[in-house]
């Protein structure tokens, strides 16, 4: 290929076509992009070897780590990507002595557009699913069917070119991801208890503190243990916000609140911050000099010249930096994206379904007339104000479920309550789409109908590959009439889009007022 890099896996890809040349819109350099492609090619080689060899638990973990590493805004470090690729190649030779070629990923990018599109859906879907399986594994939970599917899907990237079979594999990816999200839900709740509705302040108290970003609740728990009694407060950031709902985490009195808003605002919000930031997963953006000496990474996250906390999870350097920085001299008042001073979280499936009878009764009495799921990934595009405008325009007799970092567009709005039930219910992280699905399925069961027959509209925002696997799960479940934005994925070809529209009526977001009117059956 003539382009120095080729990447179109995220929503902000250049001109909604592809990133090429010297760097991507996310800040990933071309050499890192090419190294990540080589890593995927090596994983495909490993998957082929596993068909004849003897993969072990360590092989499975390496596959998860490799796929997770290539998710958008996880790894900007060409050196560590190449180290991981070498590890994958060594593992391939360990499990199977005969020679097996790796895959040249440019073959995928140069394939016919429909085949490329279907294989991209599978590849990006298993990247997202690998993140969920990786987090579950950190808590001691794994599933042989889920693990086996990664190998099957990777082999199909090279070896399957029948569009009908690939389409079935796309839906199979959604099916297996549903099982994987259930696995992670079980891992989280067994470890930390079922989330409970919790008010989370956005004000940062004076004194030393640490900001924890990403999704890894296990890393947060370890940091809370290591900082207990040391006069250091802990604040969540972005997708770590739902941690406040878990009893096993909120019991730590120094888990104080949430710092800032969506991940895309971190470069301005972290400017001259008098505290360290720990990234446990995505989304890390190119780090600016005004705070670079205070950023630490762990797990799959890697960025050149930053201090990385290894598998021993000794957070002493982070703790020392917090004490050195000292924090703010006085309490610092921060707000959400709409000016709110607090947000709520903890409305996972157990919390909501414990009030299912009450919700059903409110529907029957006409006090709740429609449900919305407004959530998904956030991002920098100005058009994402659509989601805020949509939520603001919803009538007072409607309930809104939200999740993932897209929640920051709406989670500090005061939309009131319906008989004591907040109109905005934050289900949790992106993987807690599982909770939203469980809630929808339970409501459908209560009303004796399908999810598609409920007064429910899904208004989804996407950015990276975890959103892809969630979308595939919704398609596997047969859920239709999804509004998807702020743009449709560049990797979905017109032919594949036609299939999705015909079978599922996926519709791009347009105008919040007209989309809302259609959802409510108004002209």
For the regions a language model picked out, list residue spans one by one.
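Electropositive, gly/pro-rich neighborhoods at or near active sites that engage anionic ligands
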Residues: 43-191, 197
């Amino acid at each position: 290929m003539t382009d120095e890099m080729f990447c179109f896996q995220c929503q902000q890809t250049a001109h909604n076509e592809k990133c090429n040349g010297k760097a991507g819109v996310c800040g990933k350099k071309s050499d890192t992009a090419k190294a990540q492609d080589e890593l995927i090619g090596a994983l495909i080689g490993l998957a082929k070897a596993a068909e004849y060899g003897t993969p072990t638990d360590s092989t499975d973990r390496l596959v998860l780590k490799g796929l997770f590493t290539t998710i958008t805004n996880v790894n900007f470090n060409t050196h560590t990507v190449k180290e991981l690729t070498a590890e994958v190649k060594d593992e391939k030779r360990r499990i199977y002595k005969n020679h097996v070629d790796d895959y040249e990923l440019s073959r995928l990018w140069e394939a016919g557009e429909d085949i490329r599109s279907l294989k991209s859906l599978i590849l990006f879907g298993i990247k997202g699913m690998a993140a969920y399986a990786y987090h579950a594994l950190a808590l001691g939970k794994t599933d042989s069917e889920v693990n086996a599917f990664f190998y099957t899907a990777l082999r199909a990237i090279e070896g399957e070119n029948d569009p009908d079979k690939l389409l079935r594999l796309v839906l199979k990816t959604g099916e297996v991801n549903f099982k994987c999200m259930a696995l992670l839900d079980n891992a989280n709740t067994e470890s930390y208890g079922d989330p409970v509705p919790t008010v989370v302040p956005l004000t940062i108290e004076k004194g030393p503190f640490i900001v924890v970003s990403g999704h890894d609740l296990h890393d947060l728990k370890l940091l809370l243990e290591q900082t207990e009694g040391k006069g250091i407060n802990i604040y969540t950031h972005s997708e770590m916000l739902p941690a406040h709902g878990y009893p096993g985490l909120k019991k730590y009195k120094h888990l104080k609140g949430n710092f800032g808003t969506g991940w895309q605002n971190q470069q301005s919000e972290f400017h001259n911050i008098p505290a360290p930031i720990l990234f446990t997963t995505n989304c890390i953006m190119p780090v600016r000099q005004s705070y670079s000496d205070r950023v630490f990474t762990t797990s799959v996250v890697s960025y050149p010249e930053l201090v990385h906390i290894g598998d021993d999870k000794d957070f002493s350097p982070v703790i020392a930096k917090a004490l050195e920085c000292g924090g703010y001299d006085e309490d610092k008042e921060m707000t959400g994206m709409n000016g709110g001073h607090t947000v709520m979280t903890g409305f996972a499936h157990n919390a909501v379904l414990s009030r299912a009878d009450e919700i059903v009764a409110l529907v029957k009495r006409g006090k709740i007339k429609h449900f919305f799921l407004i959530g998904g990934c956030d991002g920098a595009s100005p058009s994402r104000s659509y989601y805020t405008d949509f939520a603001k325009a919803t009538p007072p007799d409607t309930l809104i479920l939200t999740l993932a970092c897209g929640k920051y567009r709406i989670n500090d709005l005061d939309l009131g309550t319906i008989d004591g039930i907040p109109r905005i219910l934050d289900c949790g992280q992106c993987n807690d789409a599982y909770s939203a699905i469980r809630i929808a399925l339970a409501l459908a069961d209560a009303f004796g109908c399908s999810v598609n027959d409920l007064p429910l509209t899904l208004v989804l925002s996407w950015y990276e590959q975890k959103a892809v696997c969630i979308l595939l799960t919704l398609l596997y479940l047969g859920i239709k009439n999804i509004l998807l934005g702020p743009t449709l994925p560049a990797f979905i070809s017109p032919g594949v889009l036609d299939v999705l529209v015909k079978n599922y009526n996926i519709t791009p977001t347009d105008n919040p007022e007209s989309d809302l009117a259609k959802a409510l059956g108004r002209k």
